């Protein structure tokens, strides 16, 4: 009788015992009268020694990635043949029976080394890509992290609730994925971009602690590393302040990292206001793993004879600068030109520079800086071989553009420590932002966020100045989560709808059911959503969120694996009362 075990269960206690393992052929080496097979399962790998003549005939048919069953006796390897790179490297199974469970076609790429395979090929054969140890461990870690989340929150009396997947389309932000109704012809469901309204309804219902591992869907244009469907930890609590959310999430993430990666994080994360983040780092999701802080030189350069600086300051703009210490020799003119073009991508008019040699400013706009060199050198402790970049523009443009230069320079100078995790809370966000294209206000985060108390009575007088009870969690320069304290009265919610251009009729059409609920004793409540895909990407130091999703889409929101999206039959269209227009243009 053979004992069925997994590869990681092989140990010295089973020596001379009859065992059975099942798995995939990772490696096969034919040495004439002896063949060695390395078999892999989810847990580990093991070496099989085959010397029986009948079995050698079977092994001659076996190729890489065949799925096989091995029965045999566990032996110690000879000392000179011990493989220290394998956990089971001191042991091997002497094969007594071999069954080929299923064959494997010629591989589209090598499993153990598929660096030359295209992304589309790896997605088309994702089930093969997942046999790689690195990829497999990322998916296993994902499962572990989700288990830790559930366990941690359940212990704190959170209820795991499931909000609807078919919801009312309430267009705002990204486009909805729409699902036609067969029963209600001409009507459509939307797939949720987030469970936002429904988790708020759960708070109104009195279910005061909610969480969900939520699937979310956004029909966004192809860009970068976006996925049309993604997973987030969504949670909400009643009768709280933002500090309660901060503490909850800090404890949760501390537990996740400790129990999954054995990494001990600080129990409290740093906090910074949105305005300070923009001024110091040039970003509302700053990477704080390196210094390279932005300087506001508006006051210091007020006396500069440079007309651009004068005009900028007269028009209520600002001058932001980056001081690159002792690195001027590493920046050629072509590299500086490249940085200038990079700044223009972020709406900056241009990027100015100068450097210090022999205690004089030289190059770039040096002639406009030398008249005030003493002030600048003393104020900013400048030294020879220092390089300074300037952007003069309106505040937001100057901050964002110099912030992007900061990131690019830090990357080129290898200043980023990729082995640390820097969490950061950003708070005091503007509640509204002005859209120059539409000449109207829109919600900076979303329309259900609470204004700070001091702005409520004067909300409409200057929406640009209103700060919200809004907060983001940032990890290593990536926005990991976003949340807020929510509006809990119908009157205030309608005022916010009006500011963002939803008159009472539109608000009633889109959100009438929610406004009605706010009239039935809504509690103070707030929450946050944490991107699980992004969290796992950063935890595993992956280049893409595709690496941590079981079956991801490509950059065009399509699946090479199952060829979705796909056309449907005329019969299906007819059932849904739909027709497809052929646009010959």
From Swiss-Prot:
Reaction(s) catalysed (UniProt annotation): tRNA(Asx) + L-aspartate + ATP = L-aspartyl-tRNA(Asx) + AMP + diphosphate
GO biological process per UniProt: aspartyl-tRNA aminoacylation
Origin: domain of life: Bacteria
EC number from the UniProt entry: 6.1.1.23
Positions annotated to bind ATP: 218-220, 227, 479, 531-534
Quaternary data: Homodimer.
Name of the protein described by the UniProt record: Aspartate--tRNA(Asp/Asn) ligase
Species per Swiss-Prot/TrEMBL record: Borrelia duttonii (strain Ly)
Lineage of origin: Bacteria, Pseudomonadati, Spirochaetota, Spirochaetia, Spirochaetales
